[in-house]
UniProtKB/Swiss-Prot annotation:
Cytoplasm found in the keyword field: yes
Active-site residues (renumbered): C103, C200
Family statement drawn from the similarity comment of this UniProt entry: Belongs to the MnmA/TRMU family.
One BP term from GO: tRNA wobble position uridine thiolation
Catalytic reaction annotation: S-sulfanyl-L-cysteinyl-[protein] + uridine(34) in tRNA + AH2 + ATP = 2-thiouridine(34) in tRNA + L-cysteinyl-[protein] + A + AMP + diphosphate + H(+)
Main location as per UniProt: cytoplasm
Disulfides per UniProt: C103-C200
TM annotation in the entry: none
GO cellular component: cytoplasm
Domain of life: Bacteria
Region (Interaction with tRNA): 150-152, 312-313
Site residues (Interaction with tRNA), renumbered to this chain: H128, Q344
Record organism: Streptococcus pneumoniae (strain 70585)
Protein name, per record: tRNA-specific 2-thiouridylase MnmA
Length: 373
């Protein structure tokens, strides 16, 4: 039996129940555990309360309860430079970014991992719902978490083999109710704490108000694809492909009473295109182009892959053929897909294994580019 006490694991602790139980399990398994709270954003709310301060109090309470040392480290500059600037640049380009994917790649498994190594860590661990399996030759495979509704491999798809080699996901074999039960049984102060939702630096704030603090809104015309003027939009950055709510045109009808959806954008003319019907023709595509394509283990420079893919979180897998060349890929769908959104992640799977992914640049309908940016 191996002596885990000689293995140091540094746990990223957010003050939530998942990372609390992660630290608890590793401590119970005999590892040398250190808890680290990452302050990535100055998130004082409208009442003057810094939610990070409240979260850190929870980390301190849990660390004291389970008997591990803890530290707080400030990654605000790294987060601003590597995640938030990217987030703003994507919106300026008419795309819809996924900051969680970039945060995992650049902060939790780069800045944090690097910091953990200075503390003598053998591994880092987080409360993500994913699994890592190690081959005899040392190769690490990332598998979906067993809790289908909580699986977070979509957000971890940009991690490298080197990052995964140093990573543990102790919750990957558990379902969320089991995690809460373990926290309650151990009397952890975070056992009943509500899960955080949404983009970490926006939290409960109004998204439009938040974004307008950093990017000037540029109102423009809202049009149907056949040229009918539907009024004014508030700024292209506030809308995403396939969006239904927030258009302000619910009472206007075309040929039928079907609801209206965002079906396209023209950044150069500042036009937002809308159409009626969930499966409007303009929302459907047959392939996409992706860049920043990356796999969790070594792959040839150029190859073709038959696998499944997700184009957004919690979406069922779809069969695809992927033609990879360097860090770019053409992804051809077995069945047409709805609302493929530039800026979002496309993530590839082989059964339970997450193979990697990329960022969507363009969607195509029978070889013609969709007007999504």
């Amino acid at each position: 039996m191996s002596d885990n006490s000689k293995t140091r694991v540094v746990v990223g602790m957010s003050g939530g129940v998942d990372s609390s139980v992660t630290a608890l399990l590793l401590k119970e398994q005999g590892y040398d555990v250190i808890g680290i709270f990452m302050k990535n954003w100055d998130d004082t709310d409208e009442n003057g309360v810094c939610t990070a301060t409240e979260d850190y109090k929870d980390v301190v309470a849990v660390a004291d309860q389970i008997g591990i040392p803890y530290y707080s480290v400030n990654f605000e500059k790294e987060y601003w430079d590597r995640v938030f600037e990217y987030f703003l640049a994507e919106y300026r380009a008419g795309r819809t970014p996924n900051p969680d994917v970039m945060c995992n790649k650049e902060i939790k498994f780069k800045a944090f991992l690097d910091y953990a190594m200075t503390l003598g860590a053998d591994y880092v661990a987080t409360g993500h719902y994913a699994r890592v399996v190690r081959d005899e030759d040392g190769t690490v495979h990332m598998l979906r978490g067993v809790d289908n509704g909580k699986d977070q491999t979509y957000f971890l798809s940009q991690l490298s083999q080197e990052q995964l080699q140093k990573t543990m996901f102790p919750l990957g074999h558990l379902e969320k109710p089991e995690v809460r039960k373990l926290a309650e049984e151990a009397g952890l102060s975070t056992a009943k704490k509500k899960d955080s939702t949404g983009i970490c630096f926006i939290g409960e704030k109004n998204f439009k108000n938040f974004l307008s603090n950093y990017l000037p809104a540029q109102p423009g015309r809202m049009m149907t694809v056949d040229g009918r003027d539907m009024g004014e939009h508030a700024g292209l950055m506030y809308y995403t492909i396939g969006q239904r709510g927030g258009l302000g045109i619910g009472g206007q009808h075309g040929g039928d009473n079907a609801p209206w959806f965002v079906v396209g954008k023209d950044l150069s003319k500042n036009i937002l295109y809308v159409g009626q019907g969930f499966y409007h023709d303009s929302l459907m595509s047959t392939s996409l182009e992706a860049s920043q394509v990356h796999f969790t283990r070594d792959m040839p420079e150029e190859f073709t892959l038959e696998c499944t893919a997700k184009f957004r979180y919690r979406q069922p897998d779809s069969k695809v053929t992927v033609h990879v060349k360097g860090d770019k890929a053409e992804v051809i769908f077995a069945e047409p897909q709805r609302a493929i959104t530039p800026g979002q992640a496309v993530v590839f799977y082989d059964g339970e294994e997450c193979l990697g992914g990329g960022l969507i640049d363009n969607a195509y309908r029978d070889g013609q580019v969709c007007q999504y940016i």
